Amino acid sequence: MSPFRAAEAVAALLLAVLLTLLVGCGSRLPERAFETRPTANPSGGEPLRVGIITSATSPVGGQALTGPRDGARAYFDALNARGGLDGRRIEVETCDDGGSGVGNNACVHRLIDERHVFALVATTALNYAGAPLVAKAGVPDIGGQPLTPAYDTYPHLYGIYGSSAPRTGGKPGWGGTLYGGTEVYRWFEREKGARTAAVVSYNQAASAAYARLVSDGLRAEGYKVVDEQVDFALPNFRAVAADLRDRKVDLLFDAMDTHGNVRLCEAMEALGVRVDAKVTNVQNWSSSVARDYARAPGCLNSLWVTGSSRNHQDTGDPAVREFRAAMGQRPLSQWQLEGWAAAMWFTDAARSCLAGAGLTRGCVEEFLNRPEPYTARGLLLPVRFEHLARPPETRHTCLSVARWEDGRGWVGQGDMTENCATVPQLGYRP
């Protein structure tokens, strides 16, 4: 998979779990928000049914994980408005698993065994307990968000960032070890001259484990690393902010939820502490950060984000413009764009089959497993599935980078196809 994205995705799951512990139970959207939209029979044949599993009403809140689903649905709506897939409408069946393993298994059963979907698209599941069932059924799962190691474990599952792992259904990755690269840290050292970085975590096992992974990557790139840890129940963020100032930190990373990040930034604001960059991940690459960090403008304007897809505010790109037009006036996020790309990926695969011997799951998977990388019209950095027997020691990897600017939103920093470096791959156990 794209180096560092597996680790970052695990971090997204970690932050979701931490937020679950903080809020106890999350907001729930009305069930009608997740009903399957009615679809008329097309003139070109029976509808082609696809499924989308999302942890929509999980304890992390109703909007936290719905971006990929919303982006995929927008793509299929636009496709159907143009006549569908060679005359066949795409009928989208959604299922909310509630963020639990039991709910996920129920969604897999409903979509595959009862609704007989041809494929799954843009899965975003906190607990992908049903992954073995999807693999056993031979149903392709295309463009899912790798919040668990399932996309580096099972056949027939194709995560949005690709994978190099064997994916035979045994242990994740290579014997239970996954690998991530150091390209994020390399970029900030090369482009911003950063040499001192802090990693803030809770004194909680999962948070501390991810913080160690980040610290190891920073040290591998020669950074001086300042490890900061706060009490999970009674965090003293003012003390952390003061230490960041005293240690002259350039970059700030974290293994905390959004609530903790905002409180840290407010403490930094109160003490007048500034860093060159507060680096976050694709899950927070959205327009909501202006609201989240409203009381910490200094922190807001030092927010940087990295990922493997083109900035959803890059209106100079025609594929981004098409995405934005389809989304209308809705608040936008990077996960929506990646859901849109996942739906495009399925459509391109299916269309290649219709142009040949016919549409089958096997043919769709042949398209996904091609040696040629997939880019979704340039929305994604090149994605491929390699099935390497051994993990790579180094990899040439590119990076999409943006920073927040008041009045402009997320502003891209160079072309993602040129923000590249050959970096070491570091092992970690999910």
What are the language-model segments listed below?
Residues 34-36, 63-67, 83-155, 231-235:
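Beta-alpha junction/loop-to-helix N-cap segments that form part of ligand/metal-binding clefts
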Residues 162-165, 267-343, 416-419, 424-429:
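Extracellular/periplasmic periplasmic-binding protein-like sensory domains
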Residues 26-29:
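Bacterial signal peptide processing site
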Residues 111-124, 142-145, 197-201, 248-264, ...:
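Periplasmic-binding protein-like
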Residues 33-73, 97-102, 202-208, 332-337:
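Extracytoplasmic "Venus flytrap"
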Residues 21-24:
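C-terminal motif of bacterial Sec signal peptides marking the signal peptidase cleavage site
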Residues 117-229, 278-297:
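Extracytoplasmic ligand/sensor domains, especially the bilobed periplasmic-binding protein
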Residues 327-336, 347-411:
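Segments of small-molecule ligand-sensing domains
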